[in-house]
Structure formats: structure tokens, C-alpha cells
Amino acid sequence: MGILFNRKAVGCSLLVFIKGRELIVLDVLSEGLLTEEEKLKRNGLLARKPYIAKKLANISAMEARGEISPIIRLEKSYLCNFQCTHCSAEYYMDRHLDKVLHVTDDRKKIDIAKIKDISKEADELGLARFVITGGEPLVMRDLDEVVAAIDPEKHYVIVDTNGWFLDDDKAKHLKSIGVEKIQLSLDSLVEEEHDDFRNKPGSYKRVMRAIDSTVNAGLNLLLSTVLIRGQPKTQAFLDLCQFATDRNVGLYVSYAKPTGSCTDHPEFVITKEDADILRQLESKYKVFTHMTPSYGSFKGCITVKGIITVTSTGEITPCPYIDFSIGNLYENSLKEILDRGMRNPWLGPHRPDCLIGEDPKFIKIHTEKTTGAKHLPLPWGQGFSGDDSLID
């Protein structure tokens, strides 16, 4: 029979097992479960990469045991051909350090050997998903080596890109080296709006080309967009949701948060009303956020338990938008750092709201501590620490 487990989560009872090379899903009692399309995709993965498919199928069993299986975002390089208005990584980039802060970053950087170590540790913990991000991965000269170091036979590899360099040849190449999914940034179907938001004339045409190239290469596709204040009420946003739904492609919506370049644009940060409207749209369109229940599981805020980021200096942050480290991989093992994060009162307990997007107390602490910092993220002890408390 292979892997057999019973999963009970919020409103869900799910029995999953692997028989031969087929993923079987039984006894589904809730919404948001595996669609026929999703089952076909997973069965295809099982045929091509059975080891990864079995790890993905085992995530529910891990959660039932109280274990975590976060997606690992890997930021080896912050080099980027765009300078987006809302970029959360801008303050990590050499151009910002050089031109704005007039400093250099002499911290030790992760290399291919270290990425191999991270991949091995992650595999030993049962983790299965890596997102190569940055920066812009497709400007990295060593992208092929990074993919190989992660090991696409052991981990599901996703590339997060603005699409500028993603043509037919590049998409086919990414498929050939083991990449499984492309996450493409698309902020508006109005060409001028998208180009202005990305500060890159021509970027709309390039990302539309990239959508076709991704699909034609047989890669899985996810569209991502940044939601700013008031946007859920606009026809332009509804058109974007409809565009994704018509193409049967998921649209991942990231809230604009008060970090990175958005600290200069407080008017971008969404309101509770925006978030509530978006939740209503989830029932009509193929749109979701990091807070959306999936396959019957509702983690709430996914810090540590659902996602982590490995920065170019080996720091691990519990969220792409939180500039506090929970440990450095040159000082501690991945397991030690994850355990530390889950013990932290801000990060470990279930919370129904987005910590950096909706919690005023934490946002205030984060803003005060990161303001004026020359190097991010703040290391363990300066941002998060063992003395953290939710009580004043």
C-alpha cells in the first residue's frame, strides 16, 4: 500500500495512500480539497518523480503528528533587472546598500556547497518544496547549478520570476533541468498600470509572453500579484481574477505590507475591509492568499510552519516580509532553527491574522527595530529573541 495515513484538520477528514504509481484520495468531507486536475498533476508527478510525490503526500501526516513542512524560499542573489515600487527585498540589494546607505555587505554568503547542505537537511526533515527567488532568478548565471544543488529529484522546485527573460527556449530549458513550476508576477491587465507598478516599460508584454511559454513547455503555472489598498473593489482587479480563472490558473495574492520599498508607500498597505472582500472573492475565482485554507487545512498565519526564507547570508526568516532572523545556517542546523521559531510566542502558536500585515503591535515593533538598520534581516537576538513575550 505504501504511505497510509488519516488526516483530521479543521472541517476535514482525508485518507490518502499511494498504490503503485497512483495517488489515491478518499473520504473527503470538506471544501478546498484535491480537484480532479490536481489529482492528475500529482499522479503525473508520481510517475516522473515518485520520491517527491510521496513526500508531498506525506505532508498531511506530518501535520497530523504536529510536525511542520514549510516551503523553503531560497534567496541566493538579490540581483534584479526591475526596481518595483512595492519590493520587499529592495533593502537587501547591493544597489540599495551602495547608492542609499553607502555601505557594503561583508557577511558570509551561501554558495552551491551550502545549498547542497540545506537540501540534505531539508530532505532529512521530510521537507519537499523549494522556491528560488531573489532578486530575479533568471539573471543568475549559476541558476542551473542552484537547481542541481537543491536536487530536483528530491525536492519540488519552483522559480519565482518577473517573466522578462522567460521565452520559449528558457521555459523548455527550465523544464529540462528539473524545475516543476513557474510563479509569474502580474499586477494588472492594463498594460500601463502593470508597467508603472513594476517601473519597467514593456514588462506587461514580457509577462504575457512568459505565460504562454510556461504552459507550452509543460511547466505548472502560478500567477502572483500584490494587493494594495482599495484594489479589491476595482473592476481592474476583478478582471485580473477572471483572467486567471478563465485560464484555470491560480492567482496568488500577496498583501502589500509595511516592509521594504512599501515603507515609503504607507498608502499601499491594505485595510481589514480589503482582506475581507478578497476572502469573499475566493469563493468565485481561482484566487488565494497565504491565509487561505487549502485541502481542508487552515494554518492561519504561516510563519515557520508554512514558509521560511533562506537569505543570501544564511539567515532564516519566518516570512518573506519579516526582517527578523530566527537563526543562521552557519551557526545552527535547520532543525534547531525551525524548533526555535516554533517556540517563539509570535510565530509558533496559531493566529488567524497575518502577523506582519494585520497585527498593529508587531508591525510597530518591526518598524521601530528595522528603521535605520544597514543590514537585514536583523540577526537573532536583535529582532526576535528568546526573551520575546506577547505581554507588555
Predicted segment positions?
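Short cysteine clusters
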Residues: 80, 84-87, 301, 319, ...
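Conserved alpha-helical substructure of the radical SAM core
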Residues: 5-7, 27-180
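Generic structural signal for helix capping and beta-alpha/helix-loop junctions
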Residues: 94, 139, 167, 191, ...
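Radical SAM enzyme [4Fe-4S]-AdoMet core and its adjacent flexible, acidic
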Residues: 2-15, 19, 23, 176-177, ...
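Flexible mid-to-C-terminal extensions adjoining Fe-S/redox cofactors in radical SAM and related proteins
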Residues: 7, 12, 28-29, 34-35, ...
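Short loop/turn microsegments at loop-to-beta-strand junctions
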Residues: 72, 304-306
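Processing junctions and N-termini across compartments
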Residues: 74, 78-81, 295, 313, ...
